[in-house]
UniProtKB/Swiss-Prot annotation:
First-listed, main subcellular location of the protein, grouped into a coarse class: membrane
This protein's name: Xylene/toluene monooxygenase hydroxylase component XylM
E.C. code: 1.14.15.26
Subunit structure: The xylene/toluene monooxygenase is composed of two subunits: the electron transfer component XylA and the hydroxylase component XylM.
Native organism taxonomy: Bacteria, Pseudomonadati, Pseudomonadota, Gammaproteobacteria, Pseudomonadales
Name of the gene this protein is made from: xylM
Amino acid sequence: MDTLRYYLIPVVTACGLIGFYYGGYWVWLGAATFPALMVLDVILPKDFSARKVSPFFADLTQYLQLPLMIGLYGLLVFGVENGRIELSEPLQVAGCILSLAWLSGVPTLPVSHELMHRRHWLPRKMAQLLAMFYGDPNRDIAHVNTHHLYLDTPLDSDTPYRGQTIYSFVISATVGSVKDAIKIEAETLRRKGQSPWNLSNKTYQYVALLLALPGLVSYLGGPALGLVTIASMIIAKGIVEGFNYFQHYGLVRDLDQPILLHHAWNHMGTIVRPLGCEITNHINHHIDGYTRFYELRPEKEAPQMPSLFVCFLLGLIPPLWFALIAKPKLRDWDQRYATPGERELAMAANKKAGWPLWCESELGRVASI
């Protein structure tokens, strides 16, 4: 039964394929899975159960995603070419963009994320190709070499600071990860005695793959469809950065201290756990990044967030996100989970954000002892 949960991944993606095959207003079918899944994730109880799966069939869901995404774009081009999808209809264009964006972000990001942590070259190459669909084909470089080492510290561009909106975070995280990837690639080549300008530099692959998808779609389906692809990639990139935003928002850690159970937010929804390849069962992934997604242990005592779907929607309206989720959750984290040193970092972050210093009196008592 637990293995079957993960087949939600290809089923959701298949909804997009069916929509593009039939064309017309069916192109909205992929995007329509978002509100349906959100309702289920909100009304169903949280799921803290450990998984008992068939590793082969659980892993199969990961390897199906790349051919499914290629098929999704193939059916899009086919639908435009045979007239089933009309790009002169604004609602159909919007449906194409949102379906592509949603499915390129979820479940494609979680699958790509899982595969980039595998040790074999094949899944890692598949992860890079999957990341092309959300506009970040070199995501694995900074993710593995920066985020996993420096999370919850100022050195990690994937950790949003207190008071930061999702809109500014998408930009800062994108710029930060690209800069880190370029720097890491150059250092890697220098250690091998090669020039950073060597053609084996993955930065060239990054640029080539970014151009390849919209370029190929434009060639096969016309420039208008190329623009649809670019728009979907941009939105998908925002969805992708949202995962980091909501899983690490405002958390702090002393760089000299190890990563512990309280250093990530977890979203344990019954739907989002399998759909997200357990990426929302987050903290044990950071403690050991090579643990397979279905082997991650749910940590009921670790910091918890509401449904990730709800967080995404509230995050789009920063005042609501701050008032209803971010401030209450961070106040609880500071008071219940943070070490004394982390409370000092947290209050410095609050002061910078213009937030209340809710631990200041406690810090004063500790200092006076």
